[in-house]
């Protein structure tokens, strides 16, 4: 039986994901820069209602800045824009792996002038099956009509589509329509996309277990590895594969820990409360399994 990828399209924000930039060298206070990016003039500029000259003049007036300061601000940031090569390579790998089964679209709240600058950068734009700019559409994310227009244009259903974006509002709007959302920065986007697109989850899980055989130990949220028999016995019960686990056998009563190093962590004041909590959670899990 042929297995079909459950998702047919990915919408990817260009700014800060496909392309990155830095505001470290700007002369204005960072809070002023953030306010500029969120102001009404920026929204009008990104929707194509005003051109760059009008936009800069509005910002100078609204924020009591000189036109030279506004121009220098954006010139400084623009000079730092770079393609995110590793992410582009990942997108190319996806396109190669899934072929025509998966479409990739760029979406951005961006002016035509800014997009023209990005187009001059050396990336393979053929990766994208289409580009949707707020300036061309006269609407921006997170407006519902923006997503409706894109989905209608590409003839896809929300449930078949993934949005990768760096703005929580955009993700929440997409989720409300039925799209799958991945918030950039909160997780590894390549890993999250792989998890969604790789349909054979059982095979992936089995591969993970085999590649980490004998090392499937409990780890605290601070990165402390706890070698103990309880988790090993749970894995053995679930999989029936003795080659996956590391057990310390005892002739009669079993020790909870494997070796002495893990048990000595209990003596460390910093870990005592955490270990007590972890032990309680494991015991509750064991009770539920047995029940």
UniProtKB/Swiss-Prot annotation:
Superkingdom: Eukaryota
Induction: Expression is regulated by the secondary metabolite regulator cclA.
Enzyme class: lyase
Pathway annotation: Secondary metabolite biosynthesis; terpenoid biosynthesis
GO molecular function, one term: lyase activity
This enzyme's EC code(s): 4.2.3.-
Catalytic reaction equation(s): (2E,6E)-farnesyl diphosphate = (S,S)-drim-8-en-11-yl diphosphate
Reported function: Sesquiterpene cyclase; part of the gene cluster that mediates the biosynthesis of astellolides, drimane-type sesquiterpene esters that show antimicrobial, anti-inflammatory, and anti-tumor activities. The first step in astellolide biosynthesis is performed by the sesquiterpene cyclase astC that catalyzes the formation of drimanyl pyrophosphate from farnesyl pyrophosphate. Drimanyl pyrophosphate is then dephosphorylated by the sesquiterpene phosphatase astI to produce drimanyl monophosphate which is further dephosphorylated to drim-8-ene-11-ol by atsK.
Family under the similarity heading: Belongs to the HAD-like hydrolase superfamily.
PANTHER family: ALPHA-D-GLUCOSE 1-PHOSPHATE PHOSPHATASE, FLAVIN MONONUCLEOTIDE HYDROLASE 1, CHLOROPLATIC
Record's protein name: Sesquiterpene cyclase astC
Gene coding for it: astC
